[in-house]
């Protein structure tokens, strides 16, 4: 991270997998020329710890998750981690979140895989309250708890930006992702796309925002 800052890079991003099962049936969506999963999938450090170290070693470098599997962590715990990292880095954190592709991994960690974005939507509501309100109380489908206090609050107000990723499938961007961003996200993380494709996606997302 320090070397990246010295070279003039503006940001530093890390991925996330808490675990991967030793065997699983879900097909990895990012296979390359060798038609197999890359070794780094099994070698990822905890992103929040890695970024805390990166923040301490730098002064201007923006840091972010690309992406953190938000449904695999309890939102109260994650809200505190995000706020702490953003506070210690003086507002340099960007919160990229995803739902994950591996059903077996997600289910081991308590995710309702078929409805994982609904679960994440609840989690984001909880975290946004933790970041802005003196107390947070929630009664939903996936999370249910009485009023609690969660500190510290993040450096960025009202909260670090929440980004959602998407990839092109069949030559088209997912409109469902854009709708989520417009409804409760703060930004977009396009994956494996060229400038022209990104420009098309940005126009589509702006059109949805203008219609809402």
For each predicted feature, which ranges?
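Active-site-adjacent structural elements that line small-molecule/cofactor binding pockets in enzymes
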Residues: 1-212
């Amino acid at each position: 991270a320090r070397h990246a800052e010295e070279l003039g890079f503006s940001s530093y991003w890390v991925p996330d997998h808490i675990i991967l099962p030793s065997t699983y049936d879900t097909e990895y969506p990012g296979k390359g020329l060798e038609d197999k999963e890359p070794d780094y999938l099994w070698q990822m450090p905890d992103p929040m710890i890695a970024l805390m170290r990166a923040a301490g070693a730098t002064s201007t470098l923006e840091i972010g998750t690309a992406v953190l599997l938000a449904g695999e962590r309890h939102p109260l715990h994650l809200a505190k981690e995000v706020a702490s990292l953003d506070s210690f880095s003086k507002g340099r954190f960007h919160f990229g979140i995803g739902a994950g592709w591996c059903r077996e991994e997600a289910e081991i960690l308590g995710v309702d895989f078929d409805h994982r974005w609904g679960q994440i939507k609840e989690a984001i509501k909880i975290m946004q309250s933790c970041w802005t309100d003196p107390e947070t109380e929630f009664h939903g489908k996936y999370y249910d708890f009485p009023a609690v206090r969660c500190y510290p609050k993040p450096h960025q107000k009202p909260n670090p930006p929440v980004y959602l990723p998407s990839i092109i499938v069949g030559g088209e961007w997912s409109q469902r992702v854009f709708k989520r961003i417009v409804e409760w996200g703060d930004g977009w993380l396009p994956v494996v796309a060229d400038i022209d494709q990104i420009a098309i996606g940005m126009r589509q997302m702006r059109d949805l925002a203008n219609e809402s």
